[in-house]
Design a protein with these regions (language model features):
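Secondary-structure boundary elements
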Residues: 1-64
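Generic structural signal of hydrophobic/aromatic residues within well-ordered alpha-helices
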Residues: 2, 6, 19-23, 111, ...
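Alpha-helix initiation/capping motif
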Residues: 16, 57, 68-71, 104, ...
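Hydrophobic/aromatic-rich core segments of domains that either
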Residues: 42, 74-166, 173, 180
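Active-site acidic/histidine clusters and adjacent loop/turn architecture
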Residues: 65, 71-76
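Alpha-helical and coiled-coil interaction segments, frequently adjacent to or embedded
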Residues: 162-251
């Protein structure tokens, strides 16, 4: 289809053979839109692993089994579009909970410097699928293990990351059919000037996954862990905006 939210966009081709094959396997046009979107969400969230690398197409992400949040969101969106379900990107400038910051940012001096100086320009995103007349959110970036390592609930289809581990800066939430062209530039630049920094973040992510596995096992499985985490509620960071517009996290 060439209709808005169904057609191919940058890095997100719902007509790619890999996408069509997977969409069929997940029950495209057999399940209800809601059931299919949930199946696509579960697949992308739990079967693909976060890895910081330059942006490329959904076909490459599926072959590799890894990608950044935006790679994974693009796979979710492509699967929905392949199944005839309208899907779009939701983007926002954000700051993150301390546990996420420790794993993703604090492990490398260059990444930390970059994040702290860019502050407002850290863009994060989620997918949204149009189900039964309303847009439903899908945050596919973190596996259950990474969420457990951060001490937060295991989010389900329709649950927002905002307010749980990301906090959107007011007035920055945007909805888009496509990833903007400039979005992939930061990771391309980082790979060029400091491949070691990327590697350090990726090693830290893998350690976080291992830690989360243990936490889930000790809790007695994903459901038991999730119940416990929901009872506790999210631990909000104290965010202090300083003169330079840097975001400073305080314990």
């Amino acid at each position: 289809s060439n209709e808005k939210y169904l057609r191919p966009t940058l890095y997100c081709n719902p007509r790619a053979p890999e996408v069509i094959a997977l969409a069929n396997e997940l029950g495209a046009f057999e399940k209800s839109d809601r059931e299919f979107a949930e199946a696509a969400f579960e697949f992308v969230k739990e079967k693909l692993t976060l890895e910081i690398l330059p942006m490329d197409g959904v076909e490459a992400t599926l072959r590799r089994g890894t990608g950044t949040c935006f790679h994974l969101i693009s796979v979710f969106i492509a699967l929905c579009r392949a199944a005839g379900i309208k899907a779009r990107y939701k983007m926002f400038a954000m700051n993150m909970i301390q546990a996420w910051y420790n794993t993703m940012i604090d492990v490398d001096p260059l990444v930390k410097k970059w994040y702290d100086s860019m502050g407002y320009f850290m863009i994060e995103g989620e997918g949204e699928a149009y189900i039964d007349g309303k847009w439903m959110v899908a945050h596919v970036g973190p596996t259950a293990e990474r969420q457990a390592a951060a001490g937060i609930p295991i989010t389900k289809f329709g649950e927002d990351s905002l307010g749980i581990w990301y906090f959107a800066l007011p007035g920055t939430v945007m909805h888009m059919e496509s990833i903007p062209y400039g979005l992939g530039q930061a990771t391309k630049l980082l790979k060029k000037i400091a491949p070691g920094s990327m590697e350090r973040v990726n090693i830290s992510i893998l350690k976080q996954i291992e830690m989360g596995k243990k936490i889930i096992e000790e809790a007695g499985g994903k459901e038991a862990y999730d119940e416990m985490a929901r009872r506790k509620g999210p631990k909000m960071p104290k965010v202090k905006l300083e003169e330079k517009k840097e975001i400073v996290f305080e314990e």
